[in-house]
Every structure is written in C-alpha cells, then in structure tokens.
Amino acid sequence: MGHREDLLTGAKRCLEEKGWSRTTARDIVAASGANLASIGYHYGSKDALMREALFASMSDWADDVQRSFEADEPAGGGRDAELRERFETRWTRVLELFDKHQGVWRSQLEAILQVRHDPELRAAFGRAQPEGRQGLVGMLHGVDESEVDEETSRVMGSFYMTLVSGMIVQMAIDPDLMPSAHDLVEAMRRILGEAPETSETSATPEAPAAPEVPAS
C-alpha cells in the first residue's frame, strides 16, 4: 500500500481504538507508519482524513453484515410471515456485528455531536444519508440496493436508519439493555394493534376438529 492507503488504514484503526475526539494526527502517524506531512499532502487536513476514515469504516461494517447474511430466504408462512422472519433474522445479525464494530459506532456518535460546529462534517453526513438509507433497505430486504426506489428508500430506509441511530445511542449507554430483534418485531406488532404474542399465538395452530355428523 502507498502512504494514502496506509493513512486511511491507520485512521480507521484509531477510530476503533481511540474514538473520534481523542484521535490526534500523531496517533494516525504512529498507527500508519507514515509521516505528518503526508496527511496534508494526501488528504489536505487531519479532519478530512478522519471524515473519510469514518465513512470507510461504516462501509466496512455494511460489507461485513452483507457477508454474514444467509442466502436462503425463510420458507412458508405467507408473505407477512416471511417479512417478519427475515427482519428478525437479519436484524439479529446486525446486532451481533454492532457489537463487533462498536468502536466505530461510538466514533460515529462522537462525530454526530460535532456537526453543529463543523459544516464540512455536517455536509458529509448529509451526502451519506440517501446512500445509507438505500443500502439498509437493500441489506434488510435481501435485494440489490440499485433496485430500491426513491419512495421505499425514503420511507423504509429512514425507518431503518432511525433504528440504527437508536441502537448506537443505546449501545453507548448500556449495551445490555438493547432490545433484541424479536423485541422490535413484537413492539411493531403492538403499535399496529395486534395482540401481544404468546407461546400459544406463536405456535402453529392446530387443525380444527371435523364437525360431528348428526345421528340418523
């Protein structure tokens, strides 16, 4: 790798280990084996390098999630049951990889808190939003993100991004209190007015008994 790639790799490592706010230019130099002058030469500034490293790290998480998904879709149960099962299965994997990449997500949260005072960082997050929404729909629906239309990206992608944002905050406070994928599905069921799921309602219903034939 050249110095540019080394710097990006080093900055990503610093985001994971030290976080957004605590990473210094010297930390990046130490992690990359490059030199201070090369940061300005290749990226213009340490802040620009950090922005690129943050979004590259989030892209790495998305790639990791995508690789972890099983190719097979849930079979049987009708379309609604399929959607619920697929969401629960895939969101469970998302949560598992949240934990694996939690250093990056903590860094993202730190960065978000800085956007009010950093117009360039704010603009970078703004540019990433449409692509992020589209990518989340593609991952969780099991389709190529190029097939996700604008309306679906706006409605469903925004919903998924809201879930992700909430998970980032919850993880920062207390990871043990994060709701499971099943909890989220159950919450959505109740919001839509469905009865709470119990062991009886979640079980496969028994076939009705045959009607009695009246005696002749």
What are these regions (language model features)?
Residues 104-107, 112, 150-171, 181-191:
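Hydrophobic alpha-helical segments that form the core
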Residues 62, 67, 99-109, 119-144, ...:
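Amphipathic alpha-helical packing segments from all-alpha helical-bundle domains
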Residues 6, 10-52:
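Helix-turn-helix
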Residues 198-216:
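Actinobacteria-biased recognition of intrinsically disordered, low-complexity terminal regions
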